Amino acid sequence: MGKANKVVLAYSGGVDTSVCIPYLKEEYGVEHVIAFAADLGQGDELDEIKKKAISAGASQSLIGNLVKPFIEDFAFPAIRSNALYQGRYPLSTALARPLIAKKLVEIARELNADGVAHGCTGKGNDQVRFDVTIGALAPDLQLLTPAREWGMSREETIAYGEKYGIVPPVSKKNPYSIDLNLLGRSIEAGPLEDPFQMPSEEVFGITSSIADSPNEPEIADILFENGYPVAINGEEMEPVSLIKKANSLAGKHGFGRLDIIEDRVVGIKSREIYETPGLLLLIKAHQEIESLTLPADLLDTKSRLERQWADLVYKGFWFSPLKEALDGFINYSQKQVNGTVRVRLFKGNVDVIGRKSKENSLYISDMSTYGSEDKFNHKSAEGFIYVWGLPSRIWSWINK
């Protein structure tokens, strides 16, 4: 257990981080707890969260608007990387953690704090992401992790908090644990801990059910420049507005729900429900424009590195030499990723129905057509195939 006099706490307003405030003071001897809540576009009543921290005993309660850097510096690189952990989860929650941890360190430096703290438990991924990031950015700061060390059950944690006037937001009527930001929602706990039980419609908040989604399909064009999405249906937007538009567009049609078994960093499997309509839509469209503008060997290599990029981010290594090296590769690969992808949204599905790139398309109709315009030299195929298959013939000559 580390010791610190002034601590900056990553604060969400939930039970664990609220209980951390009196616990740090009573059990760790911390004199000043500075609560920091990040605005990531979640739409919470942040003023209420600020008041709640003070009520729980914080010396200061700070709110930081991180929406713009969250989307521009974390979400958009993930889109260019086609980042899907285990091929499915687009890291909507994981991407926020290194940004919050970085901000904790910055505030600690500004206010001359000698420690930082978080309320992550010992079973989750976030403890890893916070600890690894803080260790990479500020190994000299004391890192306090009361929720990992106090050994209280959920009921005991709530009872401890009630002694200090902390009211739990989770009840029998709402047993779910929900994390929300502009990229989407993650929902777990409660009835969802049974992986065979279908989630009820009440757990979803930003995607329509199939029954309630429009009965007519909608067509949308998404424009990419250097791998970045820059416009939807001809309307250019800055990144935050574009994500909001993509969320609205895809969510309305019931696209973006995930119900998956996920392998956590600590080695256990968990059942996770995600709503990430806009992010999944943009990744799908980005994959398609890449297929038109990048050569096969680059696509193949990038697809393998994308999985490694997603693994690094999921496991807390945003600020690592390998992640930085992969960023360099991905940035180079995106120079020619320019063009428009047309999608059809309908009843929970997004289908790509068109793609074009004026300057960078590697699709040449005169070479691909089977019509009279065909300019491909068919006679060259025979020699190519002979050389291409030569290793197989040599093997056969020697061994058969």
Swiss-Prot record:
Pathway: Amino-acid biosynthesis; L-arginine biosynthesis; L-arginine from L-ornithine and carbamoyl phosphate: step 2/3. GO terms for biological process: argininosuccinate metabolic process; L-arginine biosynthetic process; urea cycle. It is found in: Cytoplasm. GO terms for molecular function: argininosuccinate synthase activity; ATP binding. It holds the Pfam family Arginosuc_syn_C. HAMAP family: Arg_succ_synth_type1 (MF_00005). This is Argininosuccinate synthase. It comes from Prochlorococcus marinus (strain NATL2A).
